[in-house]
Amino acid sequence: MKKLTEEQILENLGKFYGYITKYIPTGDRQDKLLEFYKGIEVTLAISPASTKLSHHNCFAGGYVDHVNRVVEASLVLDKVWERFGQKKTYTIEELVFSAINHDLGKMGTNEEPFYLPNDSDWHREKQGAYFKINTNMTHMRVADRSLYYLQQANIPVTENEFLAIKLHDGLYEEANKPYYITYSSDVELKCNLPYILHQADLMASRVETQI
């Protein structure tokens, strides 16, 4: 299992906060985001991005490392879509906000983290499952919990951000089909942000299994 040094974890955390202060304008929303993440900073800093070695970033600090990569990939893909003539109906703030918070549902609190170290030798050795989900937490889909946490923290979310976060898993999530497969231009997604965030997340996750 990959291991980050304490210095690398802190560097990634600083980069994460840097995206908030750079791309979310100074004011109430930035303040609330920083306050929220500072309140769960221990869990934020050391959480993995997944439970198994065969999945992406299954190591302490993997969550923030993944989110940072998704932010970077989103900014690059935004330029790619522009290069090919997209009709842009979202802002860079919306793009970065969605990327920062797309997997927020994988967080818990400092007292009740979503991911816990797996205490089963069999699961670690046979399945590479070094972490497990905290079953004390109410079951929700990751995207739903992400939006729930933002609501609980009174952090405003635009329509574009809501849909990007909700749909970031693309067609890997069965519940997203009615949004992506519509058979009618009248009800198709009116913004490219969900597609861009999904592509960024997919690319980051794939690359993370190879580095």
Each model region followed by its residue ranges:
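Acidic/His-rich, divalent-metal-binding segments that scaffold phosphate/diphosphate chemistry
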Residues: M1-E125
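Divalent metal-dependent catalytic cores for phosphoryl transfer on phosphate-bearing substrates
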Residues: L53-G61, D65, L77, K88-Q210
